[in-house]
């Protein structure tokens, strides 16, 4: 087994050769084009795709539900404040003067309204763009123990490639065409500006984080979001089994850079 970035050396050293593909499985009916491109060198297929690494948005589902409830409560509270004022001569009935059963019914109705609206917020909560992510960070009243809404490894391009990968061209699809390089284009520059703003917003110092540390912080409930790779599922499930992870979590595609610029994950 070799990683795709070692295939060129293996081929040039005579340790790998063109795959005969006698059964005809090396096509997009069986593999995504990205996988086929990863095992292609000099327009020759020199390996079979076995597995791949990618980055994904990992989120604390319980915190996201808490955020959804907070937004529902704020919206309903705002609606109450905007109700028409009491007119002259109209009687104001204090809640304390209501019979206990009516008070209970009102509380139950209020809770039902909050829960219903919170479900709507939660159903649409996963960020589609970086702006959506920043909006959650801006409006989340973090409970005790939460140190930040999002933290990820800012040192490794692998966990940051999603934000520029759709527009930064290095070697074409297979990655070995020295004549196909374009990193100084308007789209890539815009993506990097968004990345810079994102990093500054969450104020992540590169010398204070590693991939292991940000995943551990997520397990400890210190963050709502992080960026994980293929191995994160195993690590989270192991933490859940030994009791160190005490919440529900989910995994989603990385959000787009903006409404106009797509991400790659």
Question: Where would I find each of the regions flagged by the language model?
Answer:
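Hinge/lid segment of periplasmic solute-binding proteins
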Residues: 4-56, 65-67, 74, 78, ...
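Sec-exported extracytoplasmic/periplasmic mature domains
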Residues: 11-15, 62-69, 138-145, 196-203, ...
